[in-house]
């Protein structure tokens, strides 16, 4: 391998690491849930929400809104587990 191939592969490797690292960082933040009143107020003031909005959630990495809490076991799941005989 000559020097230009090594340089090209190192550049691609670094770019791959940067892209993969930034994807993991943004994926951990997760979607942001907006209430319908916030969406209506934002539209009425003609402000732009930064990011892609889908069913009341905004998908972007730098958020100023309330994060959606992670989902846990449901009450139905808890009742089934609690009723099991040990």
Curated annotation (Swiss-Prot):
Coiled coil: none annotated. Keywords: Secreted, Signal. Residues 1-27 form the signal peptide. One of its GO terms (cellular component) is extracellular region. Expressed in roots. GO terms for biological process: floral organ abscission. The keyword Nuclease does not apply. It is found in: Secreted, Extracellular space. The N-terminal signal peptide is necessary for IDL1 function. Involved in an ethylene-independent separation step of floral abscission. May act with RLK5 and HSL2 as ligand-receptor pairs. IDL1 is redundant with IDA. This is Protein IDA-LIKE 1. The lineage of its organism: Eukaryota, Viridiplantae, Streptophyta, Embryophyta, Tracheophyta. The gene is IDL1.
């Amino acid at each position: 391998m000559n020097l230009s191939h090594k340089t090209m592969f190192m550049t691609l490797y670094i770019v791959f690491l940067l892209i993969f690292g930034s994807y993991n960082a943004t994926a951990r933040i997760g979607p942001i849930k907006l209430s319908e009143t916030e969406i209506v107020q934002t539209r009425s003031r003609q402000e732009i929400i930064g990011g892609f909005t889908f069913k009341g959630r905004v998908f972007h990495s730098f958020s100023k809104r309330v994060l959606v809490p992670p989902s846990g076991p449901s009450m139905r799941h808890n009742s089934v587990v609690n009723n099991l005989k040990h």
